[in-house]
Structure formats: structure tokens, C-alpha cells
């Protein structure tokens, strides 16, 4: 499998990213996986050595791409346009359509894996009923309404500041669980390579507008959903009941697999249980193909 960096095109906007492409064509129907990162991280979130979803997909022979969203990577200047969650969905819908038609494959369809704001965007993409074959969405680090402290933090950033840079050390306190849940020899330091300035607009949007949009968007999702919310989540209220309330918003979803994920914080991937979590997501992607 070939490990490469890529440039994707969405509504005429160039978006950077990375991927793993099988070197030989499989006779087995496979999902084409597209990973969508959250706020303050680039697509490298999914490719931190030792914690890489891309590497684990590669080990299973699954084609996978992670796209730098508008305002990240080579499209960082686009942050000046104040992209919202819905803007992200529209642009990425176009970029994924381009990917689907230009990548030579025998994939049965596409499965989105979205984290945090990337999970909200994945829901918004699914709600658009895209023209390319969407088979399912796997979500984590998102809910119905963020905690008040998270909203207040971003609202205080001046509106004229297009990009927000958060010191990695400050992010660690919000994104990781208790010390026993991650390997101190590696994390959180290794995650800092994936940190990136984020468009202020999306950070405000997830707190101010997402709670008003989520029920409408979730009701328009008509593909299977895999949802895991970490036990030590600090950006969203979390317990078994809130996980189920979120799942119940997907009233037209044909299959829902929702659960509280133990022993991890917001960035589940970077915890000791990250490998098990990613295996669950990849297994879900395969089930989407089997049930298509």
C-alpha cells in the first residue's frame, strides 16, 4: 500500500491531506474511508505514529484518506471566509465526490470517520444526501450541546481574528483523560505534531449554532451510524443517558451503534484504548459494505 500526501478539490478550493492506497486491486468489496478531523488538529490527527488510524486501515488493506478541512493545511487562508460547519460540509461533499470519481478502486462506497467538529461535519454531509455512495458514518467527540465553558472560551476571541492558535499544552488538559489512560512515554507530546491553528468561525459555530441544528441534521441521516463518546469527555456533557439521547436524534437512521467509551478522554485515538476504538470503527466500515 502506498503512503502519500494528496491534494483534493472541493468547490474549486484546494485541500491538502494524506492517505493510504492499496498497491494491488482487491477482489473483495471494500469501503473507501474518509477521515475528517476536529478543531485545532489537522489531518495528521489520524496519522500520529503508533496511533495512526491510517496505518491500521492499511494493515487491513483498506483504502483511506484524511482531508485537511477548509482553513487548515494549504487552505489555511480560507479561514478568512469564516467557514461554518455547513460550509465545511458543502465543500467536503464536493471534494469527496471528486475523490470518488478520480480514485481507481472497486470500493462499494464511502464511510466517513469524523472526530469532534469533524463528526458534526460528517453528520451535516450525510444530511445532504450526497450524490456519491455514502454507506455509513462513525462519530466521536460530539454531542447535542457543548458545556458552557467551551462556548464561552471561543466567544471571547475577537471576530476579526480568523485563525485561533491554542498552545498544545493547554489543549492536553481538555483532550486527555486521567494519567492512567494514556502512555506518558509517548503522549500527549506525540499528539502535538497534529496540532494546528483553527478557524475561529467553526469554534464559535459548534457552540452557538450546532445545538440549534443538530436535531434537524440528525433526522436527515439515512445511513448506519457508529457513535462512541469518551468517558472522560470535557467538552460535552457525558453519561449513558446523554449518549442515548444523542443516538435517539437519528430518527431515520437504519442502524445505530452507540455507547459510552470507557478509559479515554476527548481524543480517544491517543489513549491506551485507542487501538481498540479504531478497530471498532474499521469493523463498522466493513459491516457497512456487508449490509449495503
What are these regions (language model features)?
Residues 30, 37-42:
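Active-site glycine-rich loops that stabilize anionic/oxyanionic intermediates
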Residues 231-264:
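Conserved loop-alpha-helix segment in the C-terminal half of the alpha/beta-hydrolase fold
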Residues 151-239:
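Alpha/beta-hydrolase
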Residues 89-108:
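Conserved acidic catalytic loop of the alpha/beta-hydrolase fold
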Residues 53-76:
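Conserved alpha/beta-hydrolase
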Residues 1-25:
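N-terminal cap/lid segment of alpha/beta-hydrolase-fold proteins
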Residues 40-53, 239-241:
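The serine-hydrolase catalytic nucleophile loop
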Residues 261-274:
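Catalytic histidine-centered segment of alpha/beta-hydrolase-like enzymes
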Amino acid at each position: 500500500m502506498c503512503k502519500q500526501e494528496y491534494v483534493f478539490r472541493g468547490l474549486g478550493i484546494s485541500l491538502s491531506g494524506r492517505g493510504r492506497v492499496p498497491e494491488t486491486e482487491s477482489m473483495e468489496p471494500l469501503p473507501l474511508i474518509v477521515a475528517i478531523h476536529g478543531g485545532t488538529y489537522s489531518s495528521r490527527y489520524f496519522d500520529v505514529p503508533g496511533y495512526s488510524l491510517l496505518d491500521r486501515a492499511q494493515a487491513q488493506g483498506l483504502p483511506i484518506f484524511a482531508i485537511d478541512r477548509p482553513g487548515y493545511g494549504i487552505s489555511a487562508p480560507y479561514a478568512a471566509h469564516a467557514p461554518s460547519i455547513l460550509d465545511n460540509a458543502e465543500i467536503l461533499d464536493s471534494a469527496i465526490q471528486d475523490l470518488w470519481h478520480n480514485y481507481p478502486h472497486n470500493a462499494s462506497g464511502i464511510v466517513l470517520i469524523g472526530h469532534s467538529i469533524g463528526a458534526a461535519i460528517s453528520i451535516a454531509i450525510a444530511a445532504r444526501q450526497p450524490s456519491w455512495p455514502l454507506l455509513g458514518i462513525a462519530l466521536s467527540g460530539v454531542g447535542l450541546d457543548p458545556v458552557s465553558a467551551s462556548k464561552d472560551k471561543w466567544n471571547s476571541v475577537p471576530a476579526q481574528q480568523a485563525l485561533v492558535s491554542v498552545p498544545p499544552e493547554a489543549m492536553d488538559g481538555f483532550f486527555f483523560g486521567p494519567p492512567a489512560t494514556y502512555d506518558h512515554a509517548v503522549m500527549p507530546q506525540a499528539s502535538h505534531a497534529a496540532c494546528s491553528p483553527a478557524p475561529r468561525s467553526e469554534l464559535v459555530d459548534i457552540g452557538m449554532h450546532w445545538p440549534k441544528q443538530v436535531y434537524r441534521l440528525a433526522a436527515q441521516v439515512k445511513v448506519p451510524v457508529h457513535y462512541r463518546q469518551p468517558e472522560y469527555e470535557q467538552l460535552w456533557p457525558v453519561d449513558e443517558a446523554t449518549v442515548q439521547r444523542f443516538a435517539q436524534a437519528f430518527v431515520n437512521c437504519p442502524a445505530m451503534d452507540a455507547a459510552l467509551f470507557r478509559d479515554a478522554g476527548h481524543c480517544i485515538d491517543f489513549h491506551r484504548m485507542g487501538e481498540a476504538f479504531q478497530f471498532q470503527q474499521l469493523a463498522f466500515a466493513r459491516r457497512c459494505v456487508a449490509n449495503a
